[in-house]
Amino acid sequence: MYGIEYTTVLTFLISVILLNYVLKSLTRIMDFIIYRFLLIIVILSPFLNAPNYGINLPITGSMDTPCTNSTREEVFLTSTLCWYYPTEAATEINDNSWHGTLSQLFLTKGWPTGSIYFKAYTNIASFSVDPQLYCDYNLVLMKYDATLQLDMSELADLLLNEWLCNPMDITLYYYQQTDEANKWISMGSSCTIKVCPLNTQTLGIGCLTTDTNTFEEVATAEKLVITDVVDGANHKLNVTTNTCTIRNCKKLGPRENVAVIQVGGSDILDITADPTTAPQTERMMRVNWKKWWQVFYTIVDYVNQIVQAMSKRSRSLNSAAFTNRI
C-alpha cells in the first residue's frame, strides 16, 4: 500500500519536473525568436522608408478633414497646379509665350515649371457642362458677369463641394429631397426643369400630374442646374432628357483642392444653400483688376497663400463619373 503511494508521489514529482523543463525550454525558444525578430527589424529599419498612415487621422467623417502636414513647405515640389482661365484672357494678352512667362514666375514662388498646367475654357456655360479637375490643386478663374451671377454661383457650388450622385428615372418614379444637403443636379446643352409637388395622396399641389404645362418651371434652357425643392415632399419632374441629364445628389463636404477666384465685380459670389446662415466663401477669392496680365501677376504673387488654404486630399472631378461621385 505504501509502495503504491510512494510510486504515485514520485510519478507526480517527475511530471512536475518535466513540465517545468518543457516550459523553460519553450520560453527560451520564444525569447530567441522574438529577440532575433527585433534584431532584424533594428537592422532593416534604416533601409525602410514607408509613410505612417492612420495613427492620428479620423476614421469617420469626410476624408477631406485637414490634417497637419509636417512637409507642407515642400508641397510644391511634388504637387501639380492647374490654372483654368477663360479664352478671352489669351485673346487679350495676344502672346504665344505667355504660358512660359507665367511658368517662370511660378518658379520664383517655388513651383517647378513642369508642375503648372494651363487650361482654357470658352465661357461659364460650356465649362459647366464638362468640368474636369485633375490636378492636386486647381485654381478656377471666373470673370464676373452680372447676367451670369447665378450660373457662376451654381458652378462654384459644384466645384467646391463633393457630391455623391445616382441616376433618376423621372418617367417611373416620384422623388423627394431628404435634407438640405440633398439636391438634384442637371447638366447638358439645354436643361429645362419643371416640378410638381405632391400631397400624401400623390395628387399635385397646384398642378396636375398628367399635364406638364401646369408644372412649376424652376430652370429654363440652362447648362447647369442645382435644383432645391421642399424637403420631405414627393415631386414629379419634367426634364428635357434629350439634351440634359439629371442626378439625385448628396453633398458630402468640401472639395478642398479647388479654389474659385472671381475676377472683378462689385458683388462677391455666395454659394450658401441655407439663407439663414453666414455666407459661405471658403476658398472663394476676388481679384479686382481690369487687365488680365495684372490679374495673373496678382495670383502668382499670392499663389502660396491660396494653396495654404487648400488641401490635396480631395478627389478629382470628372463629369464622366457623374453617375457615381463628383
Curated annotation (Swiss-Prot):
Q: Name one GO molecular function term.
A: metal ion binding
What happens to this protein after translation, modification-wise? N-glycosylated.
Signal sequence: where? 1-50
Chain positions covered by the region annotation GPR motif: 253-255
Query: What InterPro entries would the database entry show?
Result: VP7, VP7_1, VP7_2
Localization in the cell = Virion; Host endoplasmic reticulum lumen
Cellular component aspect of the GO annotation: host cell endoplasmic reticulum lumen; T=13 icosahedral viral capsid; viral outer capsid
Cystine bridges: 82-135, 165-249, 191-244, 196-207
A Pfam family assignment? VP7
Give binding positions for Ca(2+) 1. 95, 206, 214, 216
Where are the residues of the annotated region CNP motif?
Answer: 165-167
- Source organism superkingdom: Viruses
Gene3D superfamilies for the chain: Glycoprotein VP7, domain 1, Rotavirus outer-layer protein VP7, domain 2
Q: What else is known?
A: Some rotavirus strains are neuraminidase-sensitive and require sialic acid to attach to the cell surface. Some rotavirus strains are integrin-dependent. Some rotavirus strains depend on ganglioside for their entry into the host cell. Hsp70 also seems to be involved in the entry of some strains. In group A rotaviruses, VP7 defines the G serotype.
Q: What is said about its interaction partners and assembly? A: Homotrimer; disulfide-linked. 2 Ca(2+) ions bound at each subunit interface in the trimer hold the trimer together. Interacts with the intermediate capsid protein VP6. Interacts with the outer capsid protein VP5*.
Hey, which family's this protein in? Belongs to the rotavirus VP7 family.
What this protein is called in its record is Outer capsid glycoprotein VP7
